[in-house]
Structures are given as structure tokens and as C-alpha cells.
A protein has these predicted regions:
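Structural motif
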Residues: 173-175, 232-236, 286-291, 345-350
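Short glycine/acidic-enriched loop and turn motifs that connect beta-strands
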Residues: 166-169, 229-232, 282-285, 398-399
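Beta-rich accessory regions
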Residues: 38-50, 56-66, 100-103, 343-345, ...
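Extracytoplasmic
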Residues: 35-122
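Surface loop/turn signatures of beta-propeller and other carbohydrate-active proteins
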Residues: 68-87, 109-149, 168-171, 186-219, ...
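Entry beta-strands of beta-propeller and related beta-repeat scaffolds
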Residues: 157-160, 215-224, 272-277, 333-338, ...
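Beta-propeller domains
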Residues: 161-188
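Conserved Ser/Thr-centered positions that define the repeating blades of beta-propeller domains
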Residues: 181, 238-240, 292-298, 350
Length: 570
């Protein structure tokens, strides 16, 4: 099914002059027009959708020969057009489509209100230089994103799909956006690959490479497993042989079996030569949890077991977006399985191919100053050739903050991080590290903090604080303060508990973007994401100081790199 369209009152006849940002759009031939509906023969694959942030929403349904092929709610521009979305009509060119729109503010349209193009409508020049767009984190070119989906590596190419609203900068109209990368750092957006259909909006899921063609789609097919969020929710499958064009399998792989079920994560269990799927599922509208299914062919699934989470009135352990993977224990023989969920909590245990047995539960993946969930719905890449387990999470920051009504996108993703399973003082724990590929963004040799002058930065700082000291870093106006008495680290005044390493040293690795800060410490065991912190654009310097004793710190090491934007060529 293809994306969706909403048509404006005065619409594209005027918009073509103001909004298409220099792209060439052709008009269309109208067969008939009536209040609430117009039949048009599109002259291109993509229809321009003018978006006015905050405008009243209208529902548009698109019909091809009586079959509904698209539907969405759109903040269709009535005054100022903030940006232009692209409705993919697929092979629509040359035959009539009916566009029906409804709602309190539904417009009356004619053929002259619509414009089409054979290519997606481009973003305006300079879009990636927006003052509120991160410069080395992934963000959608246009529209809203939330959960990362379908993270996978195939034929030397990294794939990141994501929950996407292509026609607004708030949640809704869930499609799967798609971006690809050769290095995990620079991403090229490919447009949406699956769109809402009669089974429902396209909620979260995963992707695998079916090397042995167990599903019969073709050897090496790239298979997406996702939730269609109709009533009831169902788990469904789409596939591609070229990694660009995806077709939906017309049946449900898993029918709705609980009050709510969604967000399938699929993996290959080699000892049993079968696929596994973990799916979030509510039980009797009382308890969160994760169900485990098994399959030989990615199409037919058997429920094998269930892992209980919190009761609704207790908390959100095992709530939404599960991930499930095996990791070797660093420096030891053996492995363990890790089960994560959307709101940072995870469990470590054993798995026999059908049943997960937790050994320790309700562990925290990250620390959160102020915002309980600064990042959410973390997922890991499948089929990574070198065996690394790499995670990306949805970063919460609002481009509308501070009264910015003209934003063309909203939200983004965390840095990609390599996960390892280590034995810490209190048992097995996940540790995380920025992927090595990020080092390619370093621009020249590092300097001491006092010698830094720039916008984008990576900072390494280490020292041994004495018992009553306070160590403060000023990183482009962002205050990072360690208090040895309180044993806390504060980020712009919001503190979290903080541990020193076994040698009594404070070690920080800090990434500073145009929007957002991420801190790694304690050999990967401490991670603080702060995507909503905005460094002062006028402040480009760094410094540090220590107080509280005659010699408050020992053994200081420090260095800072300027980082390059991933959009330097755009």
C-alpha cells in the first residue's frame, strides 16, 4: 500500500508557485469533481502535500478502482506552507485515482489544486543547516520519527528503518521510513517503504536477511516483520530482493492474541535452526510482558513461552519494543541472553530456543537527568558481519521548543553504540561504547579543552578527585559537574548517581552536537543521553576547574576534537 494524501482548499495551484522549492511539478486531468471527492489521473508517481504545522487535520483516502490504497491525516496548508511532503502513489501514472477527504475542516478540491512529480519533492536548500538540527545524529529529512525499526546489515550496507509521519511533525500516520549507510555515520534517506493499509498503520518491527530462503521469497531476501495496528493488531511480513522496493505478504503471520500486541523483533536461533520472535503483549489489560514465538519459515509462528513484566500499577518493566540477543561474556567463556524493552530496563538470563529464564531483571540501560526517558525504544542491528551488537535508540527532543513554528522535522536517533556484556562489581551488566566509525568525524588533532574553539565536539576528560572535591567542565556553556561528596554527576544542574572506576578515577567521554549531549563513563557502564540540551550557539569554548581542597584532583588528562558535520556535502 502506498502513502497518503490530503488536499487543500486553495491548494496546490497556488502552492506550486510558493512551495515546491524549485522542483518541476505537472498538473493532472480531472474526470469529475464533487464536494469531498475528486477523480484525477496523476501525471507522476508522487503528489505534493503542502504542510502547515498546527493546521486543522483532514483525513484523505485514496482509491484505485474502488480499492483503498492510502489514507492519512494531514495538516494541510491553508495559509503558510512550512514544508512539502511527498505522497507515493506507486504505479499510478496514467490511470484515474479518486481522492476523498473528510473531517470538520475538509477542503473542497479540484484538479487544479493537485500537483504531481516523477520524483520526491525535495527539501529546500540549506535544510540540513537548520539551527535546531543535530549535525552528527540521524534525523528524518522531513516529518516526525520515533522508534528505530528494522535495524540490519545486508550486502555491506546498513539499513535503518524508522517510525515516520511523512505529513506532520507530531506522532501519527505511521509509515516505515528508510535510510541506508555504508559507515553507520552518514545516512541517505530512501523514502517510505511501507505505508498504512486496511490492516492498520505500520507500527514497529524488525528486519532480517533470509540467507537460506526459508520463507520462499528468494535467497537472501530482506524480510521486514512489523505490526499492522488495526483492530486487532497483527504481526505481518514484507520483503525485498534489492533492499529498496518492498512488497507486503498478504496474510497475517501472527493474529492478535492479547489485549495489545506489537513490535516484533525477529532473530535466527542457530542451534534449533529456527527463527525466534519476541513481541510485546498485554495480559488481561493488567500486566506488561513479552511473548516468544518460533518459526521455520517467517510466515507461520507458534507461541513458545511468555515473560512476565510489571503489573500496570507497578511500573513499565517489559513495556513495548522488545529486543532479544545473545552476547559473549567479555574475558570469560560462555554467553548470556539479554531481553530489553522500550523504557531502558533489561534482563539477563539463559535461553533454550523456546524459553527465556531471567537470572537478573529490571536493570537500567542508561541514567536520566530530569527526563525519565530521554531516549526510548532502543533496538540493535541484525546480521552484523563482524559480530558486534550495535544499538540505536529514539532521541526525544522537540524542534518546536522555543516557539519554532516553522520546523520541517521533529525527533532523531542516538549515536550508534556497541554493546558488550561485562562482569561488573555487582554481576553481569551491559556496557556500551560509541562505535569506532564515529572517529572518522574527527577534524584534525585533539587539543586541551582550553584550546578548543568550535561547535561540534568529542571530549575525553579523566582525573582522580579527592574526597571532598567538585570537578566542573564547561562545554560550550553546558555545565557537567561531578560532586565527590554527593557522588553525583549533574548536567546543567540535573544530577544522577555517579560512580568512579576501581582506581578512583572519573573518566568522561562527551559528545556535543548542535542539539544534544551524550556522556559515556566507567568503561561503558554509565551512559547519560541528554538529547534536549541545546549548547549556546554563541559559546564555542571549553574549560574545566576543580575546587574543595588545596589539591582537589590528581592525574588530569584531557583532549577535545572538533567534529565534522555528516551533512557537509548537502
Amino acid at each position: 500500500m502506498k502513502p497518503i494524501v490530503f488536499l487543500g482548499r486553495k491548494g496546490l495551484s497556488r502552492m506550486k508557485k510558493k512551495v515546491i522549492h524549485g522542483s518541476v511539478a505537472t498538473c493532472c486531468a480531472a474526470v469529475a469533481a464533487a464536494t469531498g471527492a475528486v477523480t484525477v489521473t496523476p501525471t507522476g508517481r508522487y503528489m505534493a502535500v503542502p504542510v502547515e504545522n498546527g493546521a486543522p487535520k483532514v483525513m484523505l483516502e485514496v482509491f484505485d478502482g474502488g480499492r483503498r490504497v492510502a489514507y492519512d491525516q494531514i495538516e494541510w496548508a491553508r495559509g503558510v506552507t512550512n514544508w512539502t511532503g511527498s505522497l507515493d502513489l506507486g504505479a499510478a501514472k496514467g490511470r484515474p485515482f479518486e481522492f476523498r477527504f473528510s473531517g470538520k475542516d475538509a477542503p473542497n478540491l479540484s484538479a487544479a489544486d493537485l500537483a504531481f512529480s516523477d520524483s520526491r519533492y525535495p527539501a529546500p536548500k540549506g535544510q540540513y543547516g537548520e539551527p535546531w538540527r543535530p549535525q552528527f545524529h540521524f534525523t528524518p529529512p522531513l516529518g516526525w520519527n520515533n522508534d528505530p525499526n528494522g535495524l540490519s546489515c545486508r550486502n555491506g550496507e546498513w539499513h535503518m528503518f524508522y517510525q515516520h509521519n511523512p505529513f506532520g511533525i507530531t506522532w501519527g500516520n505511521m509509515h516505515w521510513g528508510h535510510a541506508v549507510s555504508k559507515d553507520l555515520v552518514h545516512w541517505n534517506d530512501q523514502g517510505d517503504v511501507i505505508a498504512p493499509d486496511d490492516a492498520g498503520p505500520m507500527f514497529s518491527g524488525s528486519a532480517v536477511t533470509d540467507a537460506a530462503d526459508t520463507a520462499g521469497f528468494g535467497k537472501g531476501a530482506h524480510v521486514l516483520v512489523y505490526t499492522a495496528a488495526g483492530k486487532p493488531h497483527t504481526q505481518r511480513v514484507a520483503w525485498s530482493l534489492d533492499g529498496r522496493n518492498y512488497a507486503k505478504w498478504p496474510h497475517a503471520a501472527v493474529e492478535g492474541r492479547a489485549d495489545a500486541n506489537r513490535d516484533p523483533k525477529v532473530g535466527w536461533y542457530a542451534p534449533g535452526k529456527h527463527w525466534t520472535m519476541v513481541v510485546y503483549g498485554e495480559v488481561e489489560k493488567k500486566r506488561h510482558g513479552v511473548s516468544i514465538f518460533v518459526s521455520k519459515d517467517l510466515k507461520t509462528w507458534e507461541k513458545a513461552s511468555h515473560v512476565k513484566g510489571d503489573l500496570f500499577d507497578e511500573g513499565k518493566y517489559l513495556y513495548e519494543c522488545p529486543d532479544f540477543f545473545e552476547l559473549p561474556i567479555e574475558g570469560e567463556k560462555g554467553t548470556r541472553w539479554v531481553l530489553t524493552a522500550a523504557n531502558r530496563q533489561y534482563a539477563i538470563g539463559t535461553f533454550d530456543g523456546r524459553t527465556f529464564t531471567p537470572e537478573v531483571e529490571r536493570l537500567a540501560q542508561w541514567r536520566s537527568p530530569g527526563n525519565v526517558n530521554p531516549v526510548y525504544a532502543a533496538q540493535t542491528f541484525a546480521d552484523v558481519p563482524d559480530g558486534r551488537r550495535i544499538q540505536v535508540a529514539w532521541s526525544h527532543f522537540d524542534t518546536r521548543a522555543g516557539g519554532r513554528a516553522d520546523a520541517m522535522f521533529n525527533q532523531g536517533m542516538s549515536l550508534p553504540m556497541e554493546l558488550k556484556l561485562v562482569r561488573a562489581a555487582d554481576g553481569l551488566r551491559l556496557a556500551r561504547f560509541p562505535v569506532k566509525e564515529l572517529e572518522s568525524l574527527r577534524a584534525g588533532a585533539p587539543t586541551p579543552l582550553a584550546g578548543f574553539n568550535g561547535e561540534l565536539a568529542e571530549v575525553e576528560f579523566s582525573c582522580e578527585p579527592v574526597a571532598d572535591s567538585v570537578v566542573a567542565l564547561d562545554v560550550r556553556g553546558v555545565a557537567i559537574v561531578y560532586d565527590a561528596v554527593k557522588r553525583t554527576l549533574a548536567l546543567n544542574g540535573k544530577a544522577v548517581a555517579w560512580d568512579l572506576d576501581a582506581r578512583g578515577r572519573l573518566g568522561l567521554r562527551v559528545f556535543v552536537d548542535r542539539v544534544g549531549v551524550e556522556i559515556f563513563s566507567l568503561d561503558g557502564l554509565q551512559y547519560v543521553p541528554a538529547p534536549d540540551i541545546v549548547p549556546d550557539p554563541a559559546k564555542r569554548k571549553m574549560s574545566w576547574r576543580a575546587s574543595g581542597a588545596k589539591k582537589p584532583v590528581r592525574g588530569v588528562t584531557e583532549r577535545a576534537w572538533r567534529l565534522k558535520s555528516i551533512f557537509a556535502d548537502r
